[in-house]
Amino acid sequence: VRIVCLLTALLAVSGCGMDAEKGILMAAGAYGDLAVVYADPGLDPVARQFATEVNEDQVFVIASETRFKIDIFPPENWDLAKGYKNAVFVTTAGDHGAVNKELRKLMSKEAWSQLQSGAGGLVQRKDPWATYQLLVVATGPDRNSLASLLHRNAARIRGMIESDSRTRILRHNRYEGLATGLMNSCWSRHGFYLEIPETFQLNQQGHDKVPGLELMETNPSRGITICWLDTEDPAGMLADRTRLVALRADMGRLFHHEDLVPESFTWSDGGPPGHPGVTLKGAWTGKTFAGGGPFWSYFLADKGRGRVYCIDLLTYAPGMDKMGFFRQMEAIATTFSTTRPQP
């Protein structure tokens, strides 16, 4: 157990590894499902306030979705959280109820002692009851201190869940199988590495104006398109939004038969999580059919090759929530590299 001194003590407790996955039940539901459990009836308002603060709206074109689908459970129903991909338990030190009895079984003596003394803190437990699962425990010496801890750390806990979800998604992709032949082709022909699940197929590649390739998964339609433009000044191009939009627009017309909707654009610094770059999010409309949807585009500069890459995530799923699809594709995008990982 390792204690990290940030705003509060954060302890990470390891769960089962890949070798054990065949013998352990996989947690049901989606990576956006979150159970919040309070250990004492008096903590109900604390749990509900935290659920509001840890969540946030995501806008896809004109429809707004919440990042997480949250269910809140009282102490007598704590065991329902065992079926969720993500769970946050909120409790106070010295509580001897059923929730704390279960939590004590899941933690080392060191972790438990840390939470039961002083100012409390946060604990992560990976795969507590099933594989591909994350449990976060928040403990305070009393209700007010717990509420303050959760308020200060809501964004941090959100980030912990999303970061671990990406790790779990990639872990599950590897377990289910990767399209190694297609991955090798991407490396040998185009010079980039990407962990491609077997469920994605190569839909098309190669255009004179915009070189690249499109990976597709159906039911509903989801695509990861990677294109690039050679330039003598990759860093300069990365700072030129007009050129970045032109690259994405040309790719959209050639690969997707679509137009972009400029008034929908939102920009942010950073590429896929863990990568430097620039992100553009917006909407597209079809040129050959009446429909459209959201896209996320990441632009990355490769100074060694003199190239700017665009990694584009797109879905067409009318009437369906989009966040789960983008969460899965974003995890894949984080594996992009121009340096092939060594086995």
Predicted regions and their residues:
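C-terminal motif of bacterial Sec signal peptides marking the signal peptidase cleavage site
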Residues: 12-15
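Long, folded non-catalytic interaction modules
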Residues: 23-153
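Short, well-ordered beta-strand elements
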Residues: 133-145, 224-229, 307-316
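Surface-exposed amphipathic alpha-helical segments
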Residues: 145-173, 194, 200, 307-343
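Loop-centered beta-sheet repeat module
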Residues: 171-217
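Secretory pathway targeting signatures of secreted, lumenal, and periplasmic proteins
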Residues: 21, 33-41, 56-57, 197-256, ...
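Signature of long, low-cysteine stretches enriched in small and polar/charged residues
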Residues: 77-86, 90-138, 250-306, 320-321
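Sec-dependent signal peptide recognition
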Residues: 1-7
